[in-house]
Amino acid sequence: MKLSAPAGAFRQLAAHMPEIPRADLALALVTLWLGRLCGRMDYAAGFIFMRRMGSAALTATGPVLNVLPLAVNLHATEDLPTLAKRLAAQLKKMRRHQRYDAEQIVRDSGRAAGETPLFGPVLNIKVFDYHLDLPGIQAQTHTLATGPVNDLELALFPDENGGLDIELLANAQRYDDATLSRHALRLMALITQFADNPALRCGDAQMLLAEEQTQLAHLNNTAVTIPAATLSDLVAQQAQKTPEASALADAHYHFTYREMREQVVALAYALRERGVQPGDSVAVALPRSVFLTLALHGIVEAGAAWLPLDTGYPDDRLRMMLEDAQPKLLITTQAQLARFHDIPGMEYLCYSQPLPVSDATPLRLSLPHHTAYIIFTSGSTGRPKGVMVGQTAIVNRLLWMQDHYPLTADDVVAQKTPCSFDVSVWEFFWPFIAGAKLVMAEPEAHRDPLAMQRFFAQYGVTTTHFVPSMLAAFIASLTPASAGEKLRFLKARFL
């Protein structure tokens, strides 16, 4: 690929810096361009030396070129003349070593064949052109082949009229024509920027083309206005729209949106009677069932935050979480109660049956700035730590999901993720802001691929979540017949 600097731009730039030879200026521009392209302020380039020491060598025939590694160190606060002078000083020192074969450097450095090469792109400054000045003849030389190119090779031709031509050779296995063309446009734009502003610092030069800047602005234009709403607000609004639609089910219970709201409000009042105030936290140690979902919604309705306790965790882990978080109340079952009875000062609410409902006005005590839940880290880097996640963050996530992967009233979402895993949050709430249905897998069923096949088929699940390892096990358990029969409704899988 042959390039020419924008008309007059390189000449204008050289006029601003008369103390800098044009060859040095061109080298500084290209090394800066390469460094900014690859995101490296320090890299090794190859520089071609003639290796013709003395007048006799200058007229000898045959190829004697040598390529030596040039350490390029870019500084963001440096201007172009300073960079050009530094590189020129480096090359002056290197010239005395131009007879030191690159192959010998590899051997002397103890490098093995195939290891990281001495340099990446190769640079060459040619202070001549291809035109031959012969009496009465207009002639031009042509380079038929330069040999294989490992990465990039650039030959710089600063001409006597102040222009700059560049020959760019590239490894076709690494670069295509479209990529090289765009990189070339960036180099031309870089030259124009310095011509317009000679004092521009190297770190301030813009590498994006105008259309790329526009594209980036549009691609990153993701700002949205988040409504001042809470999780309970969104669910209540949907319940008003579709009160008799199917909302929540497990193997033993089924609730419409109206019935679910009645249970949530009843539980919120029960929590208030137990002393739970807005801003408090309530621990939940329930096996997977409709009551686990109702408990989380009831806690949010009361303005509190839930602390999920996976009943599959060891007792010591659960005790540590309770001691750290100091919840106001623990919602559990009679079967689980024995695990917590010796924790000093802990109040309990056993919850495994629907509550009596009334016409009580919904509390709606949660506010957007309230904490929605507390989740503990895995502890892989030390003691697990509790993290408080706010209502606004979850509302933002759920509205984004509904915008990108919209659920409808025809969707059935599987709740199979343990409640101690943050991914479970969208399972517990997303369906209820879209009029969809949430179905609860049996406790521990998420570990059994065959049980999940039966579960998906029984409820006609359309949307589910898998961690990659479990998805692999699930797929391995399928046969062509079972996939068609058990998964005929499934359309969305989140990893």
Model-predicted regions and their roles:
Residues 120, 319, 328, 411, ...:
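Conserved acidic residues
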Residues 1-20, 110, 208-213, 241, ...:
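Flexible, P/S/T/G-rich "lid" or insertion loops adjacent to the active sites of thioester-utilizing
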Residues 37, 67-69, 78, 98, ...:
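Carrier-protein-dependent adenylate-forming modules in NRPS/ANL systems
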Residues 15-27, 37-142, 172-176, 277-280, ...:
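His-Asp-centered acyl/peptidyl-transfer active-site segments
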Residues 286-287, 375-378, 411, 417-418, ...:
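Active-site beta-alpha turn of Rossmann-fold NAD(P)-dependent dehydrogenases/reductases
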Residues 287, 334-337, 417-420, 442-445, ...:
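Adenylate-forming
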Residues 385-414, 422-462, 477:
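Conserved AMP-binding/adenylation subdomain of ANL enzymes
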Residues 1-8, 22-24, 41-47, 55, ...:
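Flexible, Gly/Pro-enriched loop and linker segments at secondary-structure and domain junctions
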